Curated annotation (Swiss-Prot):
Source superkingdom: Bacteria
The species this protein was found in: Mycobacterium sp. (strain KMS)
Annotated stretches, region: Disordered: 145-164
Subcellular location: Cytoplasm
Location, primary (coarse class): cytoplasm
Name used for this protein in its record: Ribosome-recycling factor
Record NCBIfam families: frr
Membrane-crossing residue ranges in chain numbering: none
GO molecular function annotations of the record: ribosomal large subunit binding
GO CC entries: cytoplasm
Similarity section: Belongs to the RRF family.
Keywords from the UniProt entry: Cytoplasm, Protein biosynthesis
Function: Responsible for the release of ribosomes from messenger RNA at the termination of protein biosynthesis. May increase the efficiency of translation by recycling ribosomes from one round of translation to another.
Length: 185
């Protein structure tokens, strides 16, 4: 029962780190990156569909992204979705493909994006700590019900603390890396 609780908590913490990694990759840096479009959804025949499922996204240059829709009639919808996103870019449509030029970030915008990255990192760490709290409650219940001895539960709590520290450290590293990317001119 203790092992299941620890395994479940670690699995959830891994997922929280994965979500944080995805969230941070969606924050645009000064360079073109196909991942920055991963959170954009397009209205596709009445259904909301990720842009990555409707087109191929390539980066031919450091500050240019080329988006080629699989269906030419979706050009306008994709262009509108990009324009209405929070990326702050202006796509151009030449009839076959959409070109997105990535402008240089201003110092003020960089600082805002760093704040955004730190906030996303903090949200992920709160999520990890909530997972830890729930696992600790489960361990306390196991101890109270007499399903395991006090020594076993104490050892499991220490293991859980180590695991929590490992995952919060991973999140800190992700945020630090993203901050470095954002502040790099």
């Amino acid at each position: 029962m203790i092992d299941e609780t620890l395994f479940d908590a670690e699995e959830k913490m891994e997922k929280a780190v994965s979500v944080a990694r995805d969230d941070l990759s969606s924050i645009r840096t000064g360079r073109a990156n196909p991942g920055m479009f991963s959170r954009i959804n397009v209205d596709y025949y009445g259904a909301t569909t990720p842009i990555t499922q409707l087109s191929s996204i390539n980066v031919p240059e450091a500050r240019m992204v080329v988006i080629k829709p699989y269906e030419a009639n979706q050009l306008r919808n994709i262009e509108d979705a990009i324009r209405n996103s929070d990326l702050g870019v202006n796509p151009t449509n030449d009839g076959n493909i959409i070109r997105v030029s990535i402008p240089q970030l201003t110092e003020e915008r960089r600082r805002d994006l760093v704040k955004q990255a730190k906030a996303k990192g903090e949200d992920a760490k709160v999520s990890v700590r909530n997972i830890r709290r729930k696992a600790m409650e489960e361990l306390a219940r196991i101890k109270k019900d007499g399903e395991a001895g006090e020594d076993e539960v104490s050892r499991a709590e220490k293991d859980l603390d180590k695991t929590t520290h490992t995952y919060t450290h991973q999140i800190d590293e992700l945020v630090k890396h993203k901050e470095g990317e954002l502040l790099e001119v």
